[in-house]
């Protein structure tokens, strides 16, 4: 009886590196990259646990890095859309005479690079913070950074919504956070409380960094960018305090 119980216990030990049937993105060679990307994003939004359990190659980041690059481009495009709307609104202000298209184009490209590239870098930062937190969980199996990178990247599918003006980005952010909790609970087999707390703390740390960057960017936009890009009827001067 004791031997049978021991064998049963050994059989139920969780192996975090177990391979699944393959995600749509991993099968993009047969599905086509565009269709595979959108199908992966939709599964991430509506069946995140199933998607994460189907990862075929948890030991390499080749597929997940390409997926992350495309996700980062989406956030860069979102920043471009919102920057364009902001500059268009500025051009409609009563005291505005002209908006320099060349300067505006440069600023828009700069914003795309900062948000897209920044998102790519911040994801890696999230994985490092998250890995340190779950390493402290009692009874949690050893998780490699590569595994965490691969699993959590498939939580980013709601980024498709980021290109929707105004409402899209906050909805995407909340949805991604929910997916990250699912990643910890369903794929990494953490207790729900641990999965929630670890994902939330890591996510808040990243949002804090992003908030600081956004604040600096907004100050730049208000006090410097518009100074060069927008010509008004009122003599333009940099503010003095």
What are these regions (language model features)?
Residues 1-16, 51, 88, 209, ...:
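Low-complexity, Gly/Pro
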Residues 2-74:
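N-terminal juxtamembrane cytosolic/stromal segments of multi-pass membrane proteins
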Residues 7-23, 48, 54-55, 93-103, ...:
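Hydrophobic alpha-helical transmembrane segments
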Residues 12, 16-19, 23-24, 28-31, ...:
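Selective transmembrane helix interface/packing segments
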Residues 29-44, 57, 61, 94-105, ...:
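Juxtamembrane loop-helix boundary motifs flanking transmembrane segments in multi-pass membrane proteins
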Residues 53, 85-92, 135, 182-192, ...:
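Juxtamembrane transmembrane-helix termini
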Residues 78-115, 162-173, 210-241:
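Membrane-helix interface segments in multi-pass membrane proteins
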Residues 107-111, 120-212:
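Hydrophobic alpha-helical transmembrane segments and adjacent short intramembrane/lumenal linkers
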């Amino acid at each position: 009886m004791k031997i049978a119980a021991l064998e049963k216990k050994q059989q139920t030990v969780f192996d975090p590196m177990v391979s699944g049937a393959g995600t749509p993105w991993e099968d993009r060679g047969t599905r086509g990259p565009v269709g595979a990307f959108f199908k992966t994003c939709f599964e991430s939004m509506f069946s995140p646990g199933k998607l994460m359990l189907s990862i075929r190659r948890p030991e390499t980041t080749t597929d997940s890095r390409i997926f992350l690059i495309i996700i980062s481009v989406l956030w860069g495009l979102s920043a471009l859309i919102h920057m364009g709307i902001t500059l268009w609104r500025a051009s409609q202000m009563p005291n505005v005479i002209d908006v320099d298209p060349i300067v505006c184009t440069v600023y828009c490209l700069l914003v795309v690079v900062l948000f897209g590239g920044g998102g790519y870098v911040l994801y890696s930062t999230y994985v490092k913070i998250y890995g340190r937190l779950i390493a402290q969980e009692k009874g949690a199996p050893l998780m490699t950074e590569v595994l965490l990178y691969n699993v959590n990247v498939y939580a980013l599918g709601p980024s498709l919504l980021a290109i929707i003006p105004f409402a899209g980005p906050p909805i995407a952010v909340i949805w991604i956070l929910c997916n990250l909790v699912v990643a910890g609970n369903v794929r990494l087999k953490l207790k729900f409380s641990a999965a929630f707390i670890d994902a939330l703390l890591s996510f808040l740390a990243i949002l804090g960094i992003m908030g600081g960057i956004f604040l600096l960017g907004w100050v730049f936009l208000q006090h410097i960018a518009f100074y060069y890009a927008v010509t008004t009827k009122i003599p333009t001067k940099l503010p003095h305090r």
